[in-house]
């Protein structure tokens, strides 16, 4: 079975979608074998709105490809179009039962998101979206996905207009598009409910899953992640990160993480540390997505702790259960906090202006981060250390 998945654009969102991707990989065989409900039987586009799935209200759009060259078949001529009527004429015992290993997934999306899923065992290959640089973006996107060949099913974890064009161009028998909802559920739950509804699943594992092996460090690591791609409002101050690192410089090996666009703030931290006699390793702009995951996963194995803003690396840490101090300011931590990481501690203030959800502080004061002191973070790190020691003992 061959599946196309359009990944979320942002690294953090892609990590949060990993549980839903696992559900697709694991249960696609049953989907191919005809375990569809009558919801999918018509040969036209569907739109299901405001369906309640537990605590989550999710909207899902399902598109049916009526391109003539599909000849009424299910997907890439790999099986019958199993509508409700067709199922009545099929003997279930004759339906092909594919294993998870036979499912091949083509991942489509941003460079960072694609790099994250390169190591997935069901990955056939990844395709980086190159349409943004094209003069006629929609036309380029349509033909880029059109030329990928035929698929049994296509899933999009994005809800933009361009994702609709992508699904329209995809040569797939069944197409499923995620739609945003305004409920307060965690983003992991939203993605998972989308897939559970699409595949008619009652249950699915909600654990995040990445396939990079954690690095083995020779000493406990204090990882600092001062960046946040969304905007400056989410960033704790470089001087604050440096103060925390100086407090623990004799206990941990200090490593600074960041992307190429975050070199300046990482270098500020490095400069403060070296001026105060503390050694550190600045990895800003020097690691691939794979190496980033391996290093963050290795921090927990080393007995270390990861201090981070609300960001993609924070979600990577959650996937590896790395002990984490997560610093929140303008965003809703209930929707994007470290998922299922019992080793994480969320630090935030309770100001009237929170959460503003802005990229830059609209008041110009940035009190949600400015008033979150380094001493508070140091105290929480020590508590987390004691908790980890008690659990291991």
State what each model feature region is.
Residues 1-52, 58-393:
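Catalytic machinery of carbohydrate-active enzymes
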